Swiss-Prot record:
This is Elongation factor P. Belongs to the elongation factor P family. Its main location: cytoplasm. PANTHER family: ELONGATION FACTOR P (PTHR30053), ELONGATION FACTOR P (EF-P) FAMILY PROTEIN (PTHR30053:SF12). Involved in peptide bond synthesis. Alleviates ribosome stalling that occurs when 3 or more consecutive Pro residues or the sequence PPG is present in a protein, possibly by augmenting the peptidyl transferase activity of the ribosome. Modification of Lys-34 is required for alleviation. Pathway: Protein biosynthesis; polypeptide chain elongation. Disulfide bonds: none annotated. The modification N6-(3,6-diaminohexanoyl)-5-hydroxylysine is found at K34. The lineage of its organism: Bacteria, Pseudomonadati, Pseudomonadota, Gammaproteobacteria, Oceanospirillales. It is found in: Cytoplasm.
Length: 188
């Protein structure tokens, strides 16, 4: 496997650290007035999700992590596992557990493509597309003249997620939602 020197560190790079695959979130090169230069790196463990900071002396290197990020279509859930299928024509299916799903579970919609991270042929993380279109299944009716400023109300979506929406949104409407922030963007 390839090794990466500290001068090759950048956000999004996948490396092995203490036997676990990690993703570099931030890398700051520091050259103090006295002493050796070093890199202050913020990493996320891809298995546990833990984020921490480490410093590496200039010239140190880390082994690259053998992880695959594949686009997979969400098929169904059988209670404790979520099933995804590769979209590259192989139709290979992967079962993903609750830990790997994280908070993506509330943005799941059948036949939508998600990014699944595999390590040693096991799914360790799932990430949703930036925007997803979901139907409103429950919300209070918005009354005209209800407020002086533009107000908002909670709405439950078909996936179970609850987002704040403008008063003019009604049940049955399809909304575009930002999965990174959990905020309403527009009507679909």
């Amino acid at each position: 496997m390839a090794t990466y020197s500290t001068n090759e560190f950048k956000g999004g790079l996948k490396v092995m650290l203490d036997g676990d695959p990690c993703s570099i979130l931030e890398n700051e090169f520091v050259k103090p007035g006295k002493g050796q230069a070093f890199s202050r790196v913020k990493l996320r463990n891809l298995i546990t999700g833990r984020v921490w900071e480490r410093t590496f002396k200039s010239g140190e290197s880390l082994e690259g992590a053998d992880v695959l990020e594949l686009d997979m279509e969400y098929l169904y859930s059988d209670g404790d596992m979520w099933h995804f299928m590769r979209t590259d024509g192989s139709f290979e299916q992967y079962a993903v557990d609750k830990k790997a799903m994280g908070d993506v579970e509330k943005w799941l919609k059948e036949q939508v493509v998600y990014t699944v991270t595999l390590w040693n042929d096991n799914a360790i993380a799932v990430s949703a597309p930036n925007f997803i279109e979901l139907e409103v299944v429950e919300t209070d009716p918005g009354l005209k003249g209800d407020t002086a400023q533009g107000g908002s109300k909670p709405a439950t979506l078909s996936s179970g997620a609850v987002v704040r929406v403008p008063l003019f949104i009604n049940e049955g409407e399809v909304l575009k939602v930002d999965t990174r922030t959990g905020e309403y963007v527009s009507r679909a």
